């Protein structure tokens, strides 16, 4: 249950069952019945509220504009990570269409931090910010701090995280440095065995695979590599 975490501690199975049961009491009376993701989103909101969390990081399920998580009317900051071709059946067949869905999380008069994007994607984000009078910050460099994660793209991700943290009250530069050097990201270029050396990565779209390829070439370029790929058909 790693999708529900408070201070790096996963929600227990008992707590998960408790909150889903509470949500089900309401959901079972609704037509149409909420999807499992919508129910889990509602359970997460209730869980974080009752645990009195100071700051909550909510990750969109898919897209953004029509996602269940986007029910939040106002946020400290809306974060847009690199946009590439993904979930085309639901989000659109062009980068512009997908960017339109992703930029739907931008709030009126809000703050937006975006990673480096293709020009056509950035244009969509800028237009959305203009329409909603939102302030846009472009984290289009790489972090200068030491990070724990391998891969040059992780330095780009870290730059986004830095900008976000700088706009949250109570987070110092020292906190940011410590956070980056102690970050753990399971399933993203993660070594799970040394003999033989075994790396797992959850890349599931073109951009993710390209980034994985770059990391493999950088760290294992001169070695024989065996690939095992799983695809959900």
Predicted regions located by residue number:
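Acidic-glycine-rich active-site phosphate/pyrophosphate-binding loop
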Residues: 15-16, 134-144
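Conserved beta-strand termini and adjacent loop/short-helix elements that scaffold enzyme active sites
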Residues: 115, 139-141, 192
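Nucleotide phosphate-binding/pyrophosphate-handling subdomain across enzymes
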Residues: 55-58, 66-79, 83-84, 97, ...
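Conserved catalytic-core segment of NTP-binding enzymes
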Residues: 64-66, 72-133, 233
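Short catalytic-loop micro-motif centered on adjacent basic/acidic residues
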Residues: 32-35, 112-114, 199-200, 226-228
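Alpha-helical scaffold segments in soluble metabolic enzymes
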Residues: 18, 22, 43, 47, ...
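ATP-dependent carboxylate-amine ligase catalytic core
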Residues: 1-73, 91
């Amino acid at each position: 249950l790693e999708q529900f975490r408070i201070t790096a501690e996963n929600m227990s199975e008992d707590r998960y069952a408790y909150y889903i049961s509470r949500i089900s009491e309401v959901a079972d009376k609704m037509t149409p019945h909420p999807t499992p993701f919508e129910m889990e989103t509602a359970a997460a909101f209730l869980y974080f509220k009752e645990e009195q969390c100071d700051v909550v990081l909510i990750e969109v399920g898919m897209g953004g504009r029509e996602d269940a998580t986007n029910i939040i009317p106002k946020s400290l900051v809306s974060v847009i990570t690199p946009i590439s071709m993904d979930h085309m059946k639901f989000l659109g067949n062009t980068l512009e269409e997908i960017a339109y869905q992703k930029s739907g999380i931008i709030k009126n008069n809000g703050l937006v931090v975006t990673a480096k994007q293709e020009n056509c994607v950035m244009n969509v984000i800028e237009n959305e910010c203009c329409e909603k009078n939102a302030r846009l910050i472009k984290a289009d460099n790489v972090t200068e701090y030491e990070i724990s994660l391998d891969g040059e793209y992780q330095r780009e991700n870290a730059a986004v995280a830095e900008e976000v943290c700088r706009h949250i009250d109570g987070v110092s530069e020292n906190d940011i440095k410590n956070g980056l050097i102690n970050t753990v990201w399971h399933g993203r270029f993660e070594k799970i065995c040394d003999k033989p050396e075994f790396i797992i990565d959850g890349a599931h779209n073109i951009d993710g695979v390209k980034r994985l390829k770059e990391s493999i070439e950088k760290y294992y370029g001169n070695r024989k590599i065996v690939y095992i790929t799983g695809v959900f058909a």
